[in-house]
Amino acid sequence: MHKTNFNTLLIFLFLSSCFTFLFIRCTNCSSNNFVSKKTSDTLKSIKLSTDTIIQNDTIAKKYLLGQIIPSKDTNFIAIEKKYCGKNNSYIRKEPYAAFLKMYEAALKEGIHLTILSATRTYKEQKNIWEGKWTGRYLYYGKNLASLYPNEYERTLYILKYSSMPGSSRHHWGTDIDLNSTELNYFKSGKGLKVYNWLKENAGKYGFCQPYTKKDSSRVGFEEEKWHWSYTSLSSKFLACYKRQIAYSDLTDFAGYETAIKVKLIEDYVSGINKDCR
């Protein structure tokens, strides 16, 4: 074979192998970071500045109380199964756009974020609350109605980690639960790595942990390392909630009579990390 032709062949083979390698790398990358065209097109239309989207005095009580149908509300979007642990989960578009950016950033550092829960309607929260309140659902094997016959004590126990219907931040479409709802998960190994990353980076994407460890400056719900809130919106909803919602709006569920006794609005709805207000 002529020397020139031989050198040309070597160059061709080298470039072909490089192209194949890059193609495989790009294909793998695309499969890991793929966002559907539908979601991509939707997110392009989202304006992350909320000043003209949310006006403090125009938020309806029904919205604040979770009396909504997210699938029929144009402010919401269905979460792709890739990012969520279940089907038919919805979230407001603004926090979804922010989450997608946070997801990609975390993935580059070997952190995989999964949304376990996002928007929860009044009806859904009522089902959770009354299931625990009546003993219809066993809570870690316990029938709370039998274990706590005193309604005030039962309410305090359930309120450690579950909201009364009409008082959950998940009603607003701004809050997400990530990876696990067990504190032990975040104490070591992969869970600790996830939590440390979120503490360091979630704020860059607009998210804040509302239920930090309780101390003299925070009362209400117990610590929830999995719960993250898109603050630029949730802070506005919280301000509206405290101004517009009264205990007379929280009456359509079992055990509602105890809401005022435990200071639900003052201590639980308002009892969040000051950085999230």
Walk through the language-model features, giving the residues of each.
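Cell-envelope/glycan interface and biosynthesis
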Residues: 46-277
